[in-house]
From Swiss-Prot:
The chain crosses the membrane at residues 6-26, 30-50, 62-82. The keyword Cell inner membrane applies. This is NADH-quinone oxidoreductase subunit K. NDH-1 is composed of 13 different subunits. Subunits NuoA, H, J, K, L, M, N constitute the membrane sector of the complex. It comes from Pseudomonas fluorescens (strain Pf0-1). The gene is nuoK.
C-alpha cells in the first residue's frame, strides 16, 4: 500500500488546525470551543504521525500518544467546568465565565 505523501498529510493537518482555530475564535458556545480545541489537538497529532512516518522514526507515534493523553485530560477538565457553568448560569455562553468569581 503506497504511503501518503508528506505534503498531503501536512496540508490536511494544517487545514484541520485552521478550521479548529476559526471555530475557537468564532463560536461563543463553550461546548463548540472545546470541540474546536479537540480538532486542533488532533490536527497536531496527525502532523506528528505524518512526519514520523516520513522519516521512519517512532517519535511521531510517541508524540501522538502524548497528544491524545493531553486531549483526554483537557476534555475531562473542560467538560467538568462546562457542567459547573451550566448548573450555575443555565447557559453555555462563554461570556458567562467572566461573571464567575471565586
Amino acid at each position: 500500500m503506497p504511503a501518503i505523501p508528506l505534503e498531503h498529510g501536512l496540508a490536511v493537518a494544517g487545514i484541520l488546525f485552521c478550521l479548529g482555530l476559526v471555530g475557537l475564535m468564532v463560536r461563543r458556545n463553550i461546548l463548540f470551543v472545546l470541540m474546536s480545541l479537540e480538532v486542533m489537538m488532533n490536527a497536531s497529532a496527525l502532523a506528528f504521525i505524518v512526519a514520523g512516518a516520513r522519516w521512519a522514526q517512532p517519535d511521531g507515534q510517541i508524540m501522538f500518544i502524548l497528544v491524545i493523553s493531553l486531549a483526554a485530560a483537557e476534555a475531562s477538565i473542560g467538560l467538568a467546568i462546562l457542567l459547573q457553568l451550566y448548573r450555575r448560569f443555565h447557559t453555555l455562553d462563554i461570556d458567562a465565565a467572566s461573571e464567575m468569581r471565586g
